[in-house]
């Protein structure tokens, strides 16, 4: 089990509307300014500024995943559940310090070291669902290629072994939640909460199970793939046959091209952050300085061995 979270306090962050998380050389989660707002926008209506997260449609027609995922499922899952998360989030953050932030920033700040603020569930579910829709495609499935396949074979033994472990994790994720393939480029684990610059062996693919709305962003992993194991994701098509839904998802729907693109971005991000950290590590962290550690979270998150 893994209990991790960001160290910064919400009171110091909510008044800095353009802050993004970055693993800096001072061995803890830092926050840096970024002038671009990703995912979230503000919309002017009749001269009044309102929170304006929009319900982004899946990148394909709603019937394009048939017969593996029905139009009816997407009508309910995207058109009702996902939509409700976005609408509720906009209501929750309107007029607060959070309504100037991107969706990812709202997720990270409202997680609040595991003591989630009211906006967290809707923000994370909105983010998770958008990521989920973009993880699948008509005619998906098959087998990845290139660097993604190489890392899967390195970290799991074989693609077939990865499939079995991912399916098992998703099937055994009790209740509502998500199962993820993520790129881990830090040293957060149960035995070592210290987070210095990662060594090469720390950079690896991991399978993670999270409950409810929690996702790997909150402890600074890079999500690559997710499957929604809330019942509303599959019940219309598969009833209580979760294992059949998981098999169909992995064999007929996964967009390995998208996962590969995400991996490229995750690796580039890790390299950039390591370079930035190396440049200032000696200055900010003399050898005799005691490294800071992450605080424990109240939320249990499972990383699959």
Curated annotation (Swiss-Prot):
Entry superkingdom: Eukaryota
Entry annotated with the keyword Metal-binding: yes
Biased composition annotated in UniProt, kind: Acidic residues: 277-305
Keywords: Chloroplast, Iron, Metal-binding, Oxidoreductase, Plastid, Repeat, Thylakoid, Transit peptide
Disruption outcome: Pale green phenotype. Abnormal plastids, highly vacuolated and without internal membrane structures like thylakoids.
Stated induction or repression of this protein's expression: By UV-B treatment. Induced by salt stress.
Amino acids binding Fe cation: 77, 129, 228, 232
Family classification: Belongs to the iron/manganese superoxide dismutase family.
Protein name: Superoxide dismutase [Fe] 2, chloroplastic
Gene: FSD2
């Amino acid at each position: 089990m893994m209990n991790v979270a960001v160290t910064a306090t919400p009171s110091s962050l909510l008044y800095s509307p353009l802050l993004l998380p970055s693993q800096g050389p001072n061995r803890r989660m830092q926050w840096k300014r970024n002038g671009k707002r990703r995912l979230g926008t503000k919309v002017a209506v009749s001269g009044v500024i309102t929170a304006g997260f929009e319900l982004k449609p899946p990148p394909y027609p709603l019937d394009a995943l048939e017969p593996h995922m029905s139009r009816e499922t997407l009508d309910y899952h995207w058109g009702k559940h996902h939509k409700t998360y976005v609408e509720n989030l906009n209501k929750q953050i309107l007029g607060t310090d959070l309504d100037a932030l991107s969706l990812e920033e709202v997720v990270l700040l409202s997680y609040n070291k595991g003591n989630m603020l009211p906006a967290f569930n809707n923000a994370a579910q909105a983010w998770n669902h958008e990521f989920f829709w973009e993880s699948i495609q008509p005619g998906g499935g098959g087998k990845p290629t290139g660097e993604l396949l190489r890392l899967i074979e390195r970290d799991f033994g074989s693609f077939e072994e990865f499939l079995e472990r991912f399916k098992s994790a998703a099937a055994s994720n009790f209740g509502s939640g998500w199962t993820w393939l993520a790129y881990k480029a830090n040293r957060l684990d149960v035995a070592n909460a210290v987070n210095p610059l990662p060594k090469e062996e720390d950079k690896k693919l991991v399978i993670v199970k999270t409950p409810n709305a929690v996702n790997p962003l909150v402890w600074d992993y890079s999500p690559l793939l997710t499957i929604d194991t809330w019942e509303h994701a599959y019940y219309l098509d598969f009833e209580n046959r979760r294992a059949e839904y998981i098999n169909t998802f992995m064999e007929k729907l996964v967009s390995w091209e998208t996962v590969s693109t995400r991996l490229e971005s995750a690796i580039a991000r890790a390299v950039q952050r390591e370079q930035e950290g190396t440049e200032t590590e000696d200055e900010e962290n003399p050898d005799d300085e005691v490294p800071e550690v992450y605080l424990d979270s109240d939320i249990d998150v499972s990383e699959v061995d």
